[in-house]
Swiss-Prot record:
This is DNA replication and repair protein RecF. One of its GO terms (molecular function) is single-stranded DNA binding. InterPro entries: DNA-binding_RecF (IPR001238), DNA-binding_RecF_CS (IPR018078), P-loop_NTPase (IPR027417), RecF/RecN/SMC_N (IPR003395), RecF_2 (IPR042174). One of its GO terms (cellular component) is cytoplasm. The gene is recF. Keywords: ATP-binding, Cytoplasm, DNA damage, DNA repair, DNA replication, DNA-binding, Nucleotide-binding, SOS response. NCBIfam families: recf (TIGR00611). ATP binds at residues 30-37. Coiled coil: none annotated.
């Protein structure tokens, strides 16, 4: 799968741009503030309906416009597919796939799986478990068609349960919701656990390439003691949940644990090593997607030279090339990317003040 055409209109400082990307490595270069990261962001927005730059997500629409428009043609195994998205200042989003209106943004994610390696994405290991749950759930969503519905039901039940707790409901009023909660929680947990097991099979070899002297153990924690019956736990923890006003244990507390020896990876590794570990996780996830559903991810790699030294840039780009996926990578100086590739990039784009040109 690859993007064969991308139109960007009124997105950040890009008034209008049309790109015809190549299937392999696409290098996008330009000075800071030129708009090169906005191209990656537009691709991500088209696949997720939101920005990966969460602190700037309210300002995606160009100041002179009342809406942004993104359009892409995808080359898929079954033939070409067209995706269009409009976001209005009111917050309304309109999505079409092959001319048909789409109501759920999850349909975008299913159509256009995207992996992001940016300065912000390294928070996967530096911050709390939420981003690591999202990492697991991205893979579980693509790997198992039952996951989305089960996880949607988990969130619905937790919301209802927490409202009852805040209202001081007696346990007999909560018990009905707990029966649903247990059923969906166990389904979500089984899918997540199976996914992490599958990921581990690929991850060990990739981590060995990036961090050959480091033994990283990866495990999944479900959000409650695996030796404890979840229904019994919910009943026994009712008083605690009532006191806090929310559900303390469950799949919404799951985590992906990465350890080196007896220490969390965050404490045992340098910041540079942690960045390489995140890269390994993203590459493993993309490779697993290809194995499971025969679909490539699209990789968006932002400001690579500032994040990794020359040796590790070369290693990452080799790994990305070997996946066979389409890659968009940005830099201020294109030589920092080109010199790290074993073969010339498939296409290069120069960005200046929001204007994009192909470099022949």
């Amino acid at each position: 799968m690859s993007l064969t055409r991308l139109n960007i209109e009124a997105f950040r400082n890009i008034q209008f741009a049309q790109l015809i990307p190549a299937p392999g490595i696409n290098v996008i270069y330009g000075q800071n503030g030129s708009g090169k990261t906005s191209i990656l962001e537009a691709i991500y927005f088209l696949g997720m309906g939101r920005s990966f730059r969460s602190h700037l997500s309210q300002r995606v629409i160009n100041n002179d416009n009342d809406k942004l428009t993104l359009f892409a043609t995808l080359n898929l195994a079954r033939g070409d597919s067209k995706i269009g998205l409009r976001r209005f200042r009111s917050g309304e989003t309109e999505v079409k796939i092959d001319g048909e209106k789409v109501k759920r943004l999850s349909t975008l994610a299913e159509t256009l799986p995207i992996q992001v390696i940016t300065p912000e994405s390294f928070s996967l290991l530096f911050e709390g478990p939420k981003s690591r749950r999202q990492f697991i759930d991205w893979g579980a969503f693509h790997a198992d068609p039952q996951f989305y519905g089960a996880w949607t039901n988990v969130r619905r039940v937790i919301k209802q349960r927490n409202q009852l707790l805040r209202n001081g409901a007696v346990y007999t009023h909560i018990q009905f919701w707990d029966q649903e909660f247990v059923r969906y929680a166990e389904q979500v947990t089984e899918i997540r656990n199976h996914y992490v097991d599958s990921l581990n099979g690929l991850l060990k070899g990739i981590i060995g390439e990036f961090l050959p002297s480091v033994d990283v153990k990866v495990s999944f924690t479900r959000g409650w003691d695996s030796k404890t019956d979840f229904a019994e736990l919910l009943e026994n923890q009712y008083s605690r949940d009532l006191a806090t006003g929310h559900t303390v244990s469950g799949p919404h507390k799951a985590d992906l644990r990465l350890r080196v020896g007896n220490l969390p990876a965050q404490d045992a590794l340098s910041r540079g090593q942690l960045k390489l570990l995140v890269c390994a996780l993203r590459i493993a996830q993309g490779k697993l997607l290809k194995q499971q559903i025969d679909k490539h991810s699209i990789y968006l790699v932002d400001d690579l030279p500032s994040e990794l030294d020359a040796q590790h840039r070369q290693l990452l780009l080799k790994q990305l090339t070997d996946t066979g996926a389409q890659v968009f990578v940005t830099a201020i100086d294109p030589a920092a990317i080109v010199d790290s590739l074993h073969t010339p990039p498939n296409r290069m784009f120069h960005v200046e003040q929001g204007r994009v040109t192909v470099v022949e």
